[in-house]
Amino acid sequence: MPLNVSFSNRNYDLDYDSVQPYFYCDEEENFYQQQQQSELQPPAPSEDIWKKFELLPTPPLSPSRRSGLCSTSCVSVTPFSPRGDNDGGGGSFSTADQLEMVTELLGGDMVNQSFICDPDDETFIKNIIIQDCMWSGFSAAAKLVSEKLASYQAARKDSSSPNPARGHSVCSTSSLYLQDLSAAASECIDPSVVFPYPLNDSSSPKPCASPDSSAFSTSSDSLLSSTESSPRASPEPLVLHEETPPTTSSDSEEEQEDEEIDVVSVEKRQPPGKRSESGSPSSGGHSKPPHSPLVLKRCHVSTHQHNYAAPPSTRKDYPAAKRVKLDSVRVLRQISNNRKCTSPRSSDTEENDKRRTHNVLERQRRNELKRSFFALRDQIPELENNEKAPKVVILKKATTYILSVQAEEQKLISEKDLLRKRREQLKHKLEQLRNSCA
């Protein structure tokens, strides 16, 4: 039943008093004298133009998907009697009554929830909001719903009159309602097309399908199943096709909207990689794009800096002269190669290169000098195990050690000379003894 909520204590004529300062009238002329004498609300200034901007009614609502309202016309319909007599059963509702209740609920809710008042009341028609062009769409929708309900109620009253063919008339009325519902369902957009993801509620029953809407639901289900099973397999966008041809221009426009919605949803699912592959199907295999970035190689000069906190090195062989020559040759060769590979530069760039080369050579010279000090330190017995010996100490200890070594050398040379003389004497004595024995 429609939910009609009316407030009897509210006077809708007072609505004009709140907006009266916004309407400008000439003081010499009284345009609303006749209306005030008849105690009617004066019309709004936009009364002559609101018909030009009358809005069209809203699109048809989607059919209900409840299981109690989804019985087809093939099921035997028992007539309903509001008096509760024996032939109607009193407590059972026929398909026509259920569909009428749904229609009344949908229409009544749309009007009564928008305006909390009775649509049959005169104050509802006289309200200034209805006469305004911005609110004309609601009045047009209410008028359309009321006319449709009135025609259905008149048909039901004719069918409810006592006659021998009462069951047949109720069945025909129910088939009329079912045809109207199927037409509305065919005009509506299937929610599964707009929202193609499966619902979690698997226990909810499916909506009733009429012969006209069964083809649409079958085609949409097959389209969705093919899209969900292989969303990336088809490179071309899928388009929604209906088996039933469109009857009006509004149907064709809604079909175009359905097609656009479906194309957008399918194209969003395709990754950019698949689109590129679909754009060029002749390219075979996983061929990489011809992308060869320019890599500029920079020469790396190995710089060795001594770590004083590191443990003592056990390496004793330091061919300093050869290493200096080889490193200097290698660095100069790398610098010359870099100059050959690069393009001719300006004078500033050449100066920077010279400065960089000088810094590299100077750093290499210092490293070699440091290595020489380390080698000298390792040769001194007193500083052999001292990793943190300064250079001055190394030089002093090295000088002392060299002098001591030279003194030892002179001593050993003198001893050698004495031993050689002793040998000569012994040889001469042995020769004399041999001659005496002979």
Swiss-Prot record:
Phosphorylated by PRKDC. Phosphorylation at Ser-328 by PIM2 leads to the stabilization of MYC. Phosphorylation at Ser-62 by CDK2 prevents Ras-induced senescence. Phosphorylated at Ser-62 by DYRK2; this primes the protein for subsequent phosphorylation by GSK3B at Thr-58. Phosphorylation at Thr-58 and Ser-62 by GSK3 is required for ubiquitination and degradation by the proteasome. Dephosphorylation at multiple sites by the PNUTS-PP1 complex promotes MYC stability by preventing ubiquitination by the SCF(FBXW7) complex. Pfam families: HLH, Myc-LZ, Myc_N. One of its GO terms (molecular function) is DNA-binding transcription factor activity, RNA polymerase II-specific. The modification N6-acetyllysine is found at K143, K148, K157, K274, K316, K322, K370. The modification Phosphoserine is found at S6, S62, S71, S81, S151, S159, S161, S292, S313, S328, S343, S346, S347. The keyword Nucleotidyltransferase does not apply. Glycans are attached at T58. Residues 251-262 have a biased composition (Acidic residues). There is a cross-link at K52, K143, K148, K297 (Glycyl lysine isopeptide (Lys-Gly) (interchain with G-Cter in SUMO2)). GO terms for cellular component: cytoplasm; nucleolus; nucleoplasm; nucleus. Its main location: nucleus. The modification Phosphothreonine is found at T58, T314. It is found in: Nucleus, Nucleoplasm; Nucleus, Nucleolus; Nucleus; Cytoplasm. Residues 353-405 form the bHLH domain. One of its GO terms (biological process) is G1/S transition of mitotic cell cycle. Efficient DNA binding requires dimerization with another bHLH protein. Binds DNA as a heterodimer with MAX. Interacts with TAF1C and SPAG9. Interacts with PARP10. Interacts with KDM5A and KDM5B. Interacts (when phosphorylated at Thr-58 and Ser-62) with FBXW7. Interacts with PIM2. Interacts with RIOX1. The heterodimer MYC:MAX interacts with ABI1; the interaction may enhance MYC:MAX transcriptional activity. Interacts with TRIM6. Interacts with NPM1; the binary complex is recruited to the promoter of MYC target genes and enhances their transcription. Interacts with NUP205. Transcription factor that binds DNA in a non-specific manner, yet also specifically recognizes the core sequence 5'-CAC[GA]TG-3'. Activates the transcription of growth-related genes. Binds to the VEGFA promoter, promoting VEGFA production and subsequent sprouting angiogenesis. Regulator of somatic reprogramming, controls self-renewal of embryonic stem cells. Functions with TAF6L to activate target gene expression through RNA polymerase II pause release. The 9aaTAD motif is a transactivation domain present in a large number of yeast and animal transcription factors. This is Myc proto-oncogene protein.
